[in-house]
Amino acid sequence: MLDKLENTFHFQQEALSLRNKRQEILAANIANADTPGFQARDIDFAAELKKTMENGRTGSHGLQLTMTSERHIPIKPGYRLEADLLYRVPHQTSMDGNTVDMDMERSNFADNSVKYQADVTFINSQVKSMMAVLQQG
């Protein structure tokens, strides 16, 4: 019984963590939309969640984010990401080499935000259900 609860919450915790990391990556893409040569990045959420659930977290062996220009806005100083960062293939590259498509980034940012909120709502409803069962005895 407790294993099922632990697995359910572990899955939700990992999903929230990955959604949070993706949100930071998308925010960095948006922040660097006017930076010449900036390459838009993202993660494959489904593949990363599957990998995390099968193998567990990689801990300190994660991918270290680096800036290729001093004008890039960092995601976070010393930020370590366990997910594999992918470079987004642009539909049309700008003349300065920047691959950020603001329409796509805003759409992905909003979609990820809605899914994050849905995950939080789902977890809250699970906790409330368990609390109701425990209170009723």
Curated annotation (Swiss-Prot):
Subcellular location: Bacterial flagellum basal body
Signal peptide: none
Superkingdom as given in the UniProt entry: Bacteria
Any one cellular-component term (Gene Ontology): bacterial-type flagellum basal body, rod
Residue stretches in coiled coil: none
Keyword line: Bacterial flagellum
GO term, biological process aspect, one: bacterial-type flagellum-dependent cell motility
NCBIfam families: FlgB
Subunit structure comment from the entry: The basal body constitutes a major portion of the flagellar organelle and consists of a number of rings mounted on a central rod. In Gram-negative bacteria, at least four rings, L, P, S and M are present, whereas Gram-positive bacteria lack the L and P rings. The rod consists of about 26 subunits of FlgG in the distal portion, and FlgB, FlgC and FlgF build up the proximal portion of the rod with about 6 subunits each.
Biological function: Structural component of flagellum, the bacterial motility apparatus. Part of the rod structure of flagellar basal body.
Protein family: Belongs to the flagella basal body rod proteins family.
Name recorded for this polypeptide: Flagellar basal body rod protein FlgB
Species assigned in the record: Proteus mirabilis (strain HI4320)
Organism placement in taxonomy: Bacteria, Pseudomonadati, Pseudomonadota, Gammaproteobacteria, Enterobacterales
